[in-house]
Regions:
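Conserved class I S-adenosyl-L-methionine
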Residues: 1-43, 141-165
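Acceptor-substrate binding/catalytic loop of class I
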Residues: 21, 162-178
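Class I SAM-dependent methyltransferase SAM/SAH-binding core
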Residues: 41-99
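A short, conserved alpha-helix within the catalytic core of class I
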Residues: 119-131
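A C-terminal cap/extension of S-adenosyl-L-methionine-dependent methyltransferases
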Residues: 192, 196-260
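Short catalytic micro-motifs in class I SAM-dependent methyltransferases
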Residues: 114-118
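A conserved beta-strand element that flanks and buttresses the S-adenosyl-L-methionine
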Residues: 111
Length: 260
């Protein structure tokens, strides 16, 4: 995990240790699931973390793809991410995930981390998944994560979002099983799925803020202990209800030889 004093200024929406946890969980997911080759062309579907936080992953995925692309609907977010990460072989641009300005079958890997759960309807979610499947090459892999609607605390978070109490508005989301079906309907083959990050949403945020206020830098140890305890919930049968995000890995089938 990075030094918390270095991370604090760039993770205004997450405790530094939580940002480091989220980053490592997603990087581990990419290492185990997407496995991009050094020649791969990889797309990440939003740049909020790259623009604002220490939970960024686009420029940390290994093995390093030859070309990294990132899109976001908000031009200021794209510009901020570009200022933070001046990377050769990277292309960051403003684009709608439902209407990608990307050629069909041109990407080797796609990472969509809690992007599509900001869309307004399941129809828009379906359109975005179809569009992502379109730009993926045959044999290419995609990882999609969404807010988990089976987590009871998600609905409190959604209520606060509707009241304007959050820096972003939550949109539609679906269960892991429905996400799997929607990906299959685009023609993709689903390979794996799991739940990610079991910190109790909002509750842990308030708790960590209180610990930081009381203990300052000395709060690192109790917060790290709590994060390990929450992570252990992934081993329980209740993980479908404690996970903050559903994650699904899918692959675009390679047409059989001679198929038209």
């Amino acid at each position: 995990m990075p030094n918390t004093t270095e991370a604090a200024s760039s993770s205004w929406y997450l405790d530094p240790l939580v940002a480091a946890q989220k980053r490592e969980v997603h990087l581990e997911l990419m290492r185990g699931w997407s496995n991009p080759s050094p020649t791969a062309r990889l797309l990440k579907t939003d740049l909020f973390e790259e623009a604002n936080g220490n939970d960024h992953i686009l420029f940390d995925i290994e093995p390093a793809p030859r070309r990294r692309f990132g899109i976001d609907l908000d031009i200021s977010t794209v510009q901020c991410a570009a200022r933070r990460f001046e990377q050769p072989g990277a292309g960051l641009f403003c684009c709608d995930a439902k209407h990608l300005a990307i050629a069909t079958g041109s990407l080797d890997a796609i990472v969509s981390t809690s992007t599509l759960d900001h869309l307004a309807s399941t129809d828009e979610l379906r359109d975005a998944l179809t569009e992502l499947a379109r730009v993926l090459r045959p044999g290419g892999k995609m990882v999609v994560t969404l807010d988990n609607p089976r987590n009871p605390l998600y609905w409190l978070l959604r209520l606060l979002s509707s009241w304007g109490c959050m820096p972003f508005r939550l949109g539609v989301t679906v269960s892991r099983s429905r996400l799997i079906r929607m990906l299959q309907q685009t023609g993709l083959e689903v390979l794996d799925s799991r739940m990610l990050i079991h910190n109790p949403r909002l509750v842990s945020t308030v708790l960590f803020l209180a610990l930081r206020r009381l203990l300052g830098r000395r709060a690192d140890r109790p917060i790290a202990f709590l994060l390990r305890a929450f992570a252990a919930l992934d081993r329980l049968p209740t993980r479908e209800f404690t996970g903050c995000f559903s994650a699904v890995r899918a692959r675009k089938p390679v047409p059989a030889m001679g198929a038209r």
